[in-house]
Design a protein with these regions (language model features):
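Base-recognition residues in the alpha-helical recognition helix of bacterial helix-turn-helix
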Residues: 28, 53-56
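A general lysine-centric signal
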Residues: 16, 56-59
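Residues in the helix-turn-helix
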Residues: 50
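Beta-hairpin "wing" of winged helix-turn-helix
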Residues: 60-69, 76-77
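N-terminal helix-turn-helix DNA-binding core of bacterial DNA-binding proteins
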Residues: 2, 9-47, 72-82
């Protein structure tokens, strides 16, 4: 039997974490840089509380990371996951697969 070089349970948890329309919108928005909850809520047309809930799930799955500046929290895609190919397409390397993050401006 072949062995795998990745943690299937961890990968499944990450896939579950990104498998929500709000979270996919957040990931797409963060492609352009860090944002606050308020910025994200306005951009994806959701309530601040909803965005905070989804960011907590993404943070727990290590898809996003956060930094504090004064009283503001800035969220960004986890730097260990972000990559780009030769066509300047951005992706998240989840360890078991890659998620291409579409350019919403296109």
């Amino acid at each position: 039997m072949a062995t795998t070089s990745f943690d299937a349970n961890f990968c499944a948890e990450r896939l579950k974490a990104i498998g929500d329309p709000h979270r996919l919108k957040i990931i797409s928005a963060l492609r352009y840089g860090e944002m606050t909850v308020t910025d994200l809520a306005e951009l994806i047309e959701a309530e601040n509380m909803t965005v905070s809930h989804h960011l907590k799930i993404l943070k727990y799955a290590k898809v996003v990371e956060v930094r504090r500046e004064g009283r503001f929290m800035y969220y960004r895609l986890h730097e260990d996951l972000v990559g780009a190919d030769s066509q300047k397409s951005m992706f998240l390397d989840l360890g078991c697969c890659r998620l291409e993050v579409p350019d919403r401006k296109a």
